[in-house]
Amino acid sequence: MEIKKLEAMIEAILFTMGEAVEVERIASALDHDVDTIRKIIHNMMDRYEGDERGIKIIELDNSFQMCTKAQMYEAIVKIAHVPKKHILTDVLLESLSIIAYKQPITKQQIESIRGVKSDHAVNKLVEYNLVCEVGRMDAPGRPILFGTTEDFLRNFGIASLEDLPVVAPEKVADFKMEAEEEVQLQLDI
């Protein structure tokens, strides 16, 4: 099958699905190997970025999705309803970062790290579809394990969890020292 026809079929699949589609599913549907399909999609991504187009293809954790470019927002909101923006407070961001880096994780583990109840924060993150239930811990009570979603990756502009920034070791040491000083101050009071 020629490349142009494969590109057209990939484009049709991504457009029609409207959500991220695993590269394996695309390859299977087109009776081609995954590496070839991935290369074709990456070439398409480069062309979409280079052309004056309103859409692009993004990669999300071994899946691909067609979406509009951010620069097109002004034109889109004139015709569509303005999407509700979710506000991520410091509490939500703190909880989300704990989940992102420590997943899968239970509410109790989040609360242990934060030092305060986190029910509201986790529930809001689930409501915003940034976090979801990924399973149950094999422990008494079988607590829910939480992890991030594709929407998390999409909203933060990262392709996979491996792309999360790594905290420099010297920063970790600084944070640890600050925490120890804070604990010591509380003990002195």
Swiss-Prot record:
**Protein's cellular compartments:** Cytoplasm
Alphabetical keyword list: Cell cycle, Cell division, Chromosome partition, Cytoplasm
Record-linked Gene3D superfamilies: Winged helix-like DNA-binding domain superfamily/Winged helix DNA-binding domain (1.10.10.10)
The coiled-coil regions, if any, are: none
Q: Which residues cross the membrane?
A: none
Alphabetical GO biological process terms: cell division; chromosome separation; DNA replication
Q: Mind telling me which SUPFAM superfamilies this protein's record contains? A: Winged helix' DNA-binding domain (SSF46785)
**A GO cellular component entry from the record:** cytoplasm
The record's note on quaternary structure and interaction partners says: Homodimer. Homodimerization may be required to stabilize the binding of ScpA to the Smc head domains. Component of a cohesin-like complex composed of ScpA, ScpB and the Smc homodimer, in which ScpA and ScpB bind to the head domain of Smc. The presence of the three proteins is required for the association of the complex with DNA.
List, alphabetically, the PANTHER family matched: SEGREGATION AND CONDENSATION PROTEIN B
The protein's job, in short, is: Participates in chromosomal partition during cell division. May act via the formation of a condensin-like complex containing Smc and ScpA that pull DNA away from mid-cell into both cell halves.
Q: Which family does it belong to?
A: Belongs to the ScpB family.
**Record's protein name:** Segregation and condensation protein B
The gene designation is scpB
